[in-house]
Amino acid sequence: LKKDDKKANILIWTVSAVVFAAVVILHELKIEVDLGFDPHFFARLNAIINGSVATLLLLGLYLVKSKNFMAHKRVMNLSIILSVVFLVSYIAHHILADSTVFRGEGSIKTVYYFILITHILLAGLSLPFILFSAYRASIAEFGKHKKLVRFVYPVWLYVAVTGVVVYFMI
């Protein structure tokens, strides 16, 4: 990939804005269609994808610490691809299935909503930084990549893990 920060900035911010807008708009859209299966299947799929991404992120950290940079690159690219698949599945779930209401009471309800709200906010905020990190690595600006990753990696890992936690709490 050739370095072109101006085009990369425009592309990354545009993709991030479009994804955010799509999630917000499509979250409110409901389509009644008989799929032949329970559309809540997508929630389970999302948890599996989130768990897989969390595992890959941990593996990616191990690989980079082991200086296995080629394997690290492949694992991180797979994490991004799975995150795109997650996004499609997430939108499908919210378009096709009714919302599930958390039925817990007391302090567990507070814990659930804290996890859910931080998960949603950090998922939305982290996307452009994940993309900028991937861009910096792809143009071999590893110092800048490493600076970004120190912030975005723990956030991305938190989002992936809490996605699974929210699924099991419901």
Model-derived features with residue positions:
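Alpha-helical membrane insertion/targeting regions
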Residues: 1-170
